[in-house]
């Protein structure tokens, strides 16, 4: 009889400084934060150890001592299919799965494959800042559709978007669940987005990297492909284990494209750029997408929900500050506009006063001004410390 799996210790304080860690070691370069007690709450990875089966899979490869070119990893593909069906109710054909070097790379490939220089790409803003960066770097333009707010959460604004398209749009990139707002889009909303894309002949790229990070008590995430199967001929779904299981360093994700013609165009760009999985990532993902991994994720989202409660309560004590209700992700989106403090003043207080690195809202596009995004996927003691520092940094508003 095998021993019961060890419960993850999300309260463990792991020292990541000095480990070539972007999140902790680059605060000085990006924010000018060099104090030894500075808190990294910007880059979207977690300060938790990966699940034990993932670490064991990696250790097994390392122990072999041979790190040559990998072949096709069927266990990896089977694990993706098992996970999508058991966790999301989506039966995926093996041939529909293409492996990319992370989802920013996957997004860039889609922009390259399905649009041309000078074309426009639709983004519902504020939204993950890498989307606009990738689009502009490829010589394409961004058409923004600013999200509305209803009952303190982001919502689609079809009436407000009337007439905003120029006719040059060829693609819409959707973030589902939404980053930075933490919103889980409903099946009805996804169908509306799909109908919008079909009516305007747009390719729909659905980035669903946060789909395993839906917090307890929130609406269930619906895969866009299931909500709107009629759009399969123009849909690219991007998924990855890297966000939910803290494997971002593996640089591995999936472009799931059921339509053969659409998939061939995407695969052609991959082939031209020599993109294929490395040796270490696929076995790590195969170990994560397992019953043990499912139990780990369930424990994780419960922990994150309590972190969100602690953080939100702390932000609510700052006059004029408000955190958006988090349904998914571990990224708290805080609106400081009620304080009357501009972006420069916010940075002075948060970075200079509280010694916290958080993402600047302006980088997320229209609607991001006077906002900051805080990563709360860290031990609760750090969340509590961050709250105390923020309250002190804004104490004069009391």
Where are these regions (language model features)?
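N-terminal small-domain helix-loop-helix segment of the aminotransferase-like
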Residues: 4-102, 109, 291, 397-398
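Conserved core segment of the aminotransferase class I/II
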Residues: 56, 228-305, 312-313, 394
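Conserved core of the PLP fold type I
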Residues: 67-195, 212-213, 217-230, 236
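Helix C-cap/helix->beta junction micro-motif
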Residues: 138, 199-200, 354, 397
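PLP-dependent enzyme catalytic core of the Aspartate aminotransferase-like
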Residues: 162, 340, 349-358, 363-398
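Conserved glycine-rich beta-strand-loop-beta hairpin in the small C-terminal domain of fold type I
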Residues: 286, 302-312, 323-336, 368
């Amino acid at each position: 009889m095998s021993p019961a799996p060890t419960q993850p210790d999300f309260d463990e304080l792991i020292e990541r400084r000095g480990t070539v860690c972007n999140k902790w070691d680059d605060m000085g370069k990006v924010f000018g934060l060099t104090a030894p007690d500075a808190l990294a709450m910007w880059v979207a990875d977690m300060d938790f150890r990966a699940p034990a089966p993932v670490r064991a899979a990696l250790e097994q490869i390392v122990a072999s001592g041979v790190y040559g070119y990998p072949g096709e990893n069927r266990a990896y593909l089977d694990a993706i299919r098992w996970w999508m069906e058991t966790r999301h109710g989506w039966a995926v054909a093996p041939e529909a799965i293409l492996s990319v070097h992370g989802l920013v790379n996957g997004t860039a490939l889609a922009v390259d494959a399905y649009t041309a220089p000078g074309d426009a790409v639709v983004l519902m803003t504020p939204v993950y800042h890498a989307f606009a960066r990738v689009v502009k770097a490829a010589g394409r333009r961004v058409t923004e559709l600013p999200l509305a707010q209803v009952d303190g959460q982001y919502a689609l604004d079809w009436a407000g978007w009337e007439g905003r398209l120029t006719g040059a749009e060829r693609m819409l990139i959707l973030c589902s669940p939404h980053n930075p707002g933490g919103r889980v889009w409903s099946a009805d909303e996804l169908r509306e987005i799909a109908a919008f894309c079909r009516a305007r002949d747009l390719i729909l790229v659905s980035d669903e990297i946060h789909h395993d990070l839906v917090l307890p008590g929130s609406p269930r995430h619906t895969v866009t492909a299931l909500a709107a199967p009629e759009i399969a001929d123009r849909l690219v779904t991007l998924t990855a284990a890297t966000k939910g299981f803290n494997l971002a360093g593996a640089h591995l994700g999936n472009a799931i494209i059921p339509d053969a013609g659409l998939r061939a165009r995407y695969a052609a760009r991959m082939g031209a750029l020599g993109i294929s999985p490395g040796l270490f990532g696929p076995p790590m993902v195969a170990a994560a997408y397992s019953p043990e991994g499912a139990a780990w994720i369930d424990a994780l989202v419960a922990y994150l929900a309590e972190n969100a409660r602690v953080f939100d309560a702390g932000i609510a004590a700052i006059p004029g500050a408000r955190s958006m209700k988090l349904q998914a992700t571990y990224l708290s989106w805080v609106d400081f506009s009620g304080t009357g403090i501009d972006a420069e003043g916010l940075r002075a207080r948060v970075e200079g006063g509280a010694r916290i690195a958080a993402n600047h809202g302006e980088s997320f596009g229209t609607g991001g001004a006077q906002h900051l995004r805080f990563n709360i996927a860290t031990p609760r003691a750090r969340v509590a410390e961050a709250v105390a520092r923020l309250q002190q940094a804004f104490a004069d508003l009391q």
